[in-house]
Structure formats: structure tokens, C-alpha cells
Amino acid sequence: MARSLKKGPFVDDHLMSKIAKLNETEQKQVVKTWSRRSTIFPQFIGHTIAVYDGRKHVPVYITEDMVGHKLGEFAPTRTYKGHDADDKKTRR
């Protein structure tokens, strides 16, 4: 179910304050975060945010198209290695 419009989008305060500080000083640094639930705001555009996927931080460069999505959408947590190509030989 989608979030109620009257509540507005969610972003963790610590992440927003880090981005605001970088925007004031006009620095470009990688910001590490564990907050996959945070919504991407227009202030994030042009920054690289390292989102934790359960074992490492995945660097995500924020573009205009990503605004409104969640950070976790761009750091997949599961690795799919694929099925065995020739499964018939093992069944005989």
C-alpha cells in the first residue's frame, strides 16, 4: 500500500542534514547510509550516496529521474546466479 499523501514523503533526518551540509559547502563526497527507506529528494541530485545492501555499501549517483523513488530500489539485496544451463544430464 502506498504512503498517504497527507503525510508527505519520508527521509531520515541524519541523511537530510548530511546532504544539506554538503550543499552549503558545495562539496561532492560519498555519503554512507543504511537508510534504504528514505525517499530521494531534489536536493540529492548530483550527489553519490552509498546505500547498504546487507553486506556492502553500493554507490548510487542520484539523477533527476530518481526523485520520488526510494534509495533501496537502486541497491539490490539478492544476487541471482541463474539456473543450471544443462539440467537434463543430471536427471538421467
Swiss-Prot record:
Keyword rRNA-binding attached: yes
Keyword annotations of the record: Ribonucleoprotein, Ribosomal protein, RNA-binding, rRNA-binding
Source organism of this protein record: Bacillus cytotoxicus (strain DSM 22905 / CIP 110041 / 391-98 / NVH 391-98)
One GO MF term attached to the UniProt entry: rRNA binding
Similarity annotation: Belongs to the universal ribosomal protein uS19 family.
Protein known as: Small ribosomal subunit protein uS19
CC annotations in GO: cytoplasm; small ribosomal subunit
Keyword Ribosomal protein: yes
